[in-house]
Regions:
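Hydrophobic faces of well-ordered beta-strands that scaffold small-molecule active sites
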Residues: 2-6, 47-51, 89-91, 113-117, ...
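Aromatic/acidic polysaccharide-binding cleft in carbohydrate-active enzymes
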Residues: 163-233
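Structural recognition of alpha->loop->beta junctions
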Residues: 45-49, 107-114, 195-204
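Active-site groove signature of glycoside hydrolases
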Residues: 29-65, 118-121, 161-172, 211
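Aromatic-lined carbohydrate-binding surfaces of glycoside hydrolases
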Residues: 1, 5-23, 96
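Acidic, His- and aromatic-enriched active-site or binding-groove loops in soluble protein domains
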Residues: 22-43, 70-71, 113-122, 187-194, ...
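A generic secondary-structure signal for well-formed alpha-helical elements
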Residues: 2, 19-30, 53, 76, ...
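Noncatalytic carbohydrate-binding groove/subsite architecture in carbohydrate-active enzymes
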Residues: 65-192
Length: 233
C-alpha cells in the first residue's frame, strides 16, 4: 500500500486536498481529470496519509506544540477527507509522549485513528575486536529494550483503543562508512517478530522499514544493486 505524508507547514489545506483528489479522484473531479490527461486513467486509490512528519521535534518546521498541531491536523485532515472520505489518516508527534497523547492524538481520533511512532537503534561499528560479541548482542537486544518498550509505553499513554499505532519508521541507524552486516539482518528478523507479536496486544496496525534504498534493505551501486542482510529478511 502507498503511504503519503503531507507537509502542513509548506502547503495549504487546499493543496493537500488537491493532492488527495489527484490520487483518488475520478473524471468528475478537477484533479482527477488532470491525472487522466497525463495518461493515468484509473485512480491510484491511496488510502493511507500522514498529517506531517515528526512534529514536536526541534528539527521540524511549523507548530511543534501538541495543542497547535492538533488544531492544524484537524483542519487539514477534515479538508482531505472531504476530497476522499475513505482515507485512513495518521497523526504525527514525538511519541511516546503523554502531553501529545492527551492534546493531539485523542483529540484527532475521530478523523485520524492512527498515530505515528519512529525508532532507530544505534548500530555498533565493530571497531574493537574484543567488543564484537558485546556490541552484537547489544544491538539485537534493542528490539526488546528499546523498540518493544516504546510500543508498550505509547499504548499505555494513548489509552483509547480506537487509536492504533503506525510504527512507520524503524531501522538500524545508517552510516555510509559502515558496511551492512549479518547483525542488521538478525535485528530486522527480530524486529519483524516483535511487530507480529505486538500487533494484537499493542494495537500496531501498520509498520514500515525505513529507508529502503541505500539505508537499509537495498544497496544501489553505480553498476549493480543487491539486497543487504536486512533486505534478505
Amino acid at each position: 500500500e502507498p503511504f503519503i505524508t503531507i507537509n502542513p507547514t509548506w502547503n495549504t489545506e487546499e493543496e493537500c486536498a488537491q493532492w488527495v483528489e489527484y490520487c483518488n479522484g475520478d473524471a468528475n473531479t478537477e484533479y482527477g481529470r488532470i491525472r487522466i490527461e497525463r495518461g493515468y486513467k484509473d485512480p491510484y486509490n491511496v488510502k493511507y496519509w500522514s498529517l506531517g512528519n515528526e512534529f514536536g521535534y526541534g528539527h521540524m518546521e511549523g507548530d511543534n506544540t501538541a495543542a497547535g498541531y492538533g488544531k492544524k491536523g484537524r483542519s487539514y485532515g477534515t479538508k482531505m477527507l472531504e476530497a476522499s472520505p475513505d482515507l485512513i489518516l495518521c497523526s504525527s508527534g514525538p511519541y511516546p509522549n503523554k502531553e501529545w497523547a492527551e492534546q493531539s492524538a485523542r483529540q484527532l481520533v475521530d478523523i485520524a485513528p492512527m498515530v505515528s511512532l519512529h525508532s532507530y537503534v544505534a548500530q555498533p561499528f565493530f571497531m574493537e575486536k574484543e567488543q564484537y560479541k558485546e556490541d552484537y548482542y547489544e544491538c539485537i537486544d534493542k528490539v526488546d529494550t528499546q523498540c518493544r518498550k516504546l510500543v508498550h509505553q505509547m499504548r499505555e499513554e494513548l489509552g483509547d483503543d480506537r487509536l492504533r499505532i503506525s510504527f512507520d519508521e524503524w531501522n538500524v541507524w545508517y552510516a555510509w562508512y559502515r558496511a551492512k552486516s549479518v547483525n542488521d539482518g538478525i535485528f530486522t528478523a527480530s524486529m519483524l517478530h516483535m511487530l507480529i507479536e505486538e500487533a494484537g496486544p499493542s494495537g500496531i496496525d501498520m509498520a514500515c522499514h525505513f529507508e529502503a534504498v541505500n539505508e537499509g534493505a537495498i544497496r544501489v551501486e553505480w553498476d549493480h544493486s543487491f539486497l543487504t542482510p536486512s533486505g534478505k529478511m
